[in-house]
From Swiss-Prot:
Transiently phosphorylated on a His residue during the reaction cycle. Phosphorylation strongly increases the affinity for substrates and increases the rate of nicotinate D-ribonucleotide production. Dephosphorylation regenerates the low-affinity form of the enzyme, leading to product release. The gene is pncB. Its EC number is 6.3.4.21. Keywords: Ligase, Phosphoprotein, Pyridine nucleotide biosynthesis. Pfam families: NAPRTase, NAPRTase_N. This is Nicotinate phosphoribosyltransferase. One of its GO terms (molecular function) is nicotinate phosphoribosyltransferase activity. The lineage of its organism: Bacteria, Pseudomonadati, Pseudomonadota, Betaproteobacteria, Burkholderiales. The modification Phosphohistidine is found at H216. GO terms for biological process: NAD biosynthetic process via the salvage pathway. It comes from Ralstonia pickettii (strain 12J). GO terms for cellular component: cytosol.
Amino acid sequence: MIIRSLLDTDLYKFTMMQVVLHHFPGAHVEYRFKCRNAGVDLVPFIEEIRAEIRHLCTLRFTDTELDYLRGMRFIKSDFVDFLGLFHLNEKYIDVRPAPSNDGQIEIVIAGPWLHTIMFEVPVLAIVNEVFFSRTQTHPQWEEGKRRLTDKLASLKRPGLEDCRIADYGTRRRFSHTWHEHVLLETHAQLGAQYAGTSNVYFAMKHGMTPLGTMAHEYLQACQALGPRLRDSQTFALETWAKEYRGDLGIALSDTYGFDAFLRDFDMFFCKLFDGVRHDSGDPFEWGERMLKHYDDMRAEPKSKALIFSDSLDMPKVIGLYERFHGRCKLAFGVGTNLTNDLGYTPLQIVIKIVRCNGQPVAKLSDAPEKTMCDDPAYLTYLKQVFGVQ
């Protein structure tokens, strides 16, 4: 079986789930799957994907895993007690061929947010591993190792000693086994330049630092949960601050486009949050504008962190490091390029929240192709409310 532990997911699923438990326990949501690769036929793998999901729904947290979570300073004891009773339920997820008959599949996850939030990452990892295990029966392990060695060597150049990367690649990894190899090799080769991993299972198993705060789904759901739509981003950040009281202080900047984020991210938030994460649009322009915004808001840029996580490879990491090093704190989250580069075209697959409490929700990304919404009229209205062209 592909997923062997409920910890085999990203840390931010736990940090968001805790907010859901304490602030939105009655929220209902719907997620949908999308494969952005043209011509990929996933239909032949449906039964195997279903079988893997069936197994996923039998898993429970072990006492050792619960003790590990309890040891995190920002995880509260009542949340761990809840996780002790938690398991994923098959009735909330449906996998079927798409009506278009073009090889696409539909994965619909619908139910209480508290009981569905944990599906996304392991289900994407399942789709990836099933697909590659069936289409690449003799993987090019040596080519993958060569590519990884070259990437890590590029970060060992003089002048890059403070350039640190983290693994954000669980959802689109080639396989569980390859993911673990990549992490161990990266840790061994980079030492202090390896910041940690978003994967909680591997962090626990290998004594690495687990990393993550919030994802777009949290800010999107707040469109339906806050007092009014225009204030939903502010509401999401304020609710986060109420829950974590200054901990986990990295805000995500592109749910409504960067211009709208800067309007909402006022002096209070600039001083309260430790930094901001970039996930779409030109990262160099974004970084310059963010540092200027900190200056304008009288927040010392050198005390703040810029986190880059959008489709990074090593040349882009190095370029960003050279541009911003010394001007602020820096961190880089590398995903697919780290955990799924054996020479094959990776799957561009996502599972996105599309509804909350029966209302459509959407992301107005700085990369238009990342926008995903099943209600065009709502998308138009959302753009109007947030002043997005």
